[in-house]
């Protein structure tokens, strides 16, 4: 509840920064790093990459609003202070972006399933999400999963291991692409 409320406050704050978080650019960036360090381990990578391009093209065509978005809305980045206030920390990925990306990132960082993601959207919107809103959130879940899978593959090439995280993120990409197609 507090995470959703804090994100909504951020998104409605009117604060701006001079840079954006561009998921297409970030995917290309980590894809390049992976290619330079041995490539990816996914047999169906070309197919999944094509699906991600499709989602990015659909989102671009929607011309969604850009507001200050945190991007790294993992539970550990929400500080609950003794006075009852909530503070967001760790702003390294923050930039101007579609605000619904923060809901998607919160869902994948928390390993939410579809039911928990639905509840998160209901809290954020204060109502049942519309089909188009659900499609946008699911698209960003797929894209976020794909991005963080690439990030983890690159980090693994440097000797860091993340256990099942890489596969969980890649699975989000594949699963939520299919969910978008059903909407």
Predicted stretch roles:
Residues 7, 11-15, 128:
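Protein kinase-like catalytic domain
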